[in-house]
């Protein structure tokens, strides 16, 4: 009798569950890498993989994949969506991060041509690193967010939402540390914020107000007093 008590729970369809990762980095814009200019343009970049199989073979997409229900020996897999996101990111790009943050669930009926698939989207910020395609990804590459290829599935929508989420977080959460080197100037940090907010020259953040806010919040501190004396407009933090 007890075995049949919850039998009804298996009468409902079981959609597949996947994770997708939006991984942002910050580096010299591709067009300026070979330039001899002293002040090269920096760009917010996103990590994409080239799909090695159908559907959308050869198209670019966000790194991600299916939540495991079984391990390699056929036993039930103890994997939550965060572990799945970390595993897929590592397998498909070689990027190994400590954590990712969920920001939205996508469940539109026809978002995947194979079957009903619900994906849990995650966001990560990393210092720019070398990447390599692996597992079912034919390639992995960083792209300037303003110069993207056409993306598979609904991944453009996911990326747009992630960028909006990042722009919201920047107003209440310090994010520069994940994207900047260990030491940086206040000017470089301001440039990062202007880049994320897509501010042009007419709408960029006020330098003095930005400096005051960062110091008041206590999230940065001078790395070298001599550097401060040497050039106050470029204090190292």
List where the protein language model places each region:
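NUDIX/MutT-family hydrolases
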Residues: 123-124, 131-170, 179-192, 210-218
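The catalytic Nudix box helix
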Residues: 62, 67-101, 122, 189
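A short, conserved structural fragment
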Residues: 216-228
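N-terminal strand-loop-strand
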Residues: 6-62, 82
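Core subunits and conserved enzymes of cellular information-processing
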Residues: 1, 32-34, 40-41, 49, ...
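Acidic pyrophosphate-coordinating catalytic loop
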Residues: 106-118, 130
